A protein has these predicted regions:
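Catalytic, metal-anchored helix/loop core of enzyme active sites in primary metabolism
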Residues: 1-359
Length: 359
């Protein structure tokens, strides 16, 4: 690693996680330096980010858009395009850590190249482990690479696991807000509109992840991610609904102790921890005021109304190519819903049908 500030490349800097990452960099500018950023569709924002941070490399991942992309005010910035450009960025010698924040399976190739190059990975792209978990974790082991979770739930588990040994873990408990429809009946779920699904009560996320949260497919994918990231069997992974999103996940040990990580629902904290690890820094994330009364509820999930959770458990247990199949089916189904071709309840039903046909 270079001396001085840690050099960061952000894959997906224009998305929700990417923007929050840059908020952390602004607050920790003496410790972090942006070497490269990538964007796909929001090129106006990508230009503004490049002008502010003056990275060595800016990548437009859509080659067609890259052909007409003009970047003013950045004389020292090289503009690259496509997946090849992403791979060139993450393999630069001066990159210390890669924030993998491209949404969906599109994030796998750049993350894979970064691991092969020996870069520390701050992983926000859960689809990397959903689609290729055993392969990615084996590659990281072979290359001596740390994969540090950015998902708030997996960051919480990662931190709580530091307090014990693997054989002492009874289970990990992923918390879920339950999404905007946690109190909806099955009949009301059939009438959910696109606008309804995009109105998440707690987190500010992009449209695909927001829909995943509403169907609870996001939590299903997190079950699979936890399976591979922490090397856990499926019987040691549980989910509870926690609407306040203050307890981000828990680890229960064999003596009955439960260790939880708590903070307001602000993605800047797990992002910063992944970039500061193994240290902790002052940062921009909101803090809990323990002098103000608050309450925390925990409820068992309803598998009948939210069957995506069952798909997550099934895929985590089956392994093989099932994760890639589920992820592809879900990406297609969510796109169909957002385009008005599928009803909300048909998203998970379509995924179920695809898995049924998968050998």
């Amino acid at each position: 690693m270079t001396s001085g500030p840690k050099n960061i490349a952000i894959l997906g800097s224009t998305g929700s996680i990417g923007r929050s990452t840059l908020d952390v960099v602004r607050a920790c500018c003496d410790r972090l330096r942006i070497v490269g950023i990538t964007g796909h569709a929001n090129l106006e924002l990508l230009s503004r980010q490049a002008q502010e941070f003056q990275p060595a490399v800016t990548v437009v991942s859509d080659p067609q858009k890259a052909a007409t992309f003009q970047l003013a005010g950045c004389p020292e910035t090289t503009v690259l395009s496509g997946q090849a450009g992403i791979c060139e960025l993450v393999t630069r010698e001066d990159v210390d850590l890669v924030v993998s924040a491209i949404v969906g399976s599109a994030g796998l190739r750049g993350t894979w190249a970064a691991i092969e190059a020996g870069k520390t990975i701050a992983l926000a792209n859960k689809e990397t482990l959903v689609t290729a978990g055993p392969l990615v974790m084996q590659l990281a082991s072979d290359c001596g690479v740390d994969i540090l979770p950015v998902d708030s739930e997996h960051s919480a588990i990662f931190q709580a696991l530091k307090s014990g040994r693997g054989k002492e873990v009874s289970r990990v408990v992923l918390t879920a807000s339950g999404g905007p429809f946690r109190n909806h009946s099955a009949e009301r779920l059939g009438d959910v509109t696109i606008e309804d699904a995009l109105a998440h009560p707690t987190w500010d996320m992009g449209p695909k992840i927001t829909v995943d949260s509403a169907t609870m497919m996001n939590k299903a994918l997190e079950i699979i991610e936890a399976r591979w990231l922490f090397g856990l069997s499926i019987d040691k992974i549980d989910v509870v609904v926690h609407p306040q999103s203050i307890v981000h996940s828990m680890v229960e040990y064999c003596d009955g102790s439960i260790l939880a990580q708590m903070s307001p629902p602000d993605m800047k904290l797990p992002i910063q921890y992944a970039m500061s690890y193994p240290e902790r820094w002052e940062g921009p994330a909101e803090k809990i005021d323990l002098t103000q009364a608050f309450h925390c509820e925990f409820h068992p999930p309803d598998y009948e109304r939210f069957p995506a959770l069952l798909l997550g458990r099934e895929v985590a247990e089956r392994g093989g190519s099932c994760g890639a199949v589920l992820n592809a089916a879900n990406e297609s189904a969510v796109a169909g819903f957002l385009a008005g071709r599928l009803k909300f309840t048909e998203i998970v039903a379509a995924c179920r049908d695809v898995l049924n046909y998968h050998d």
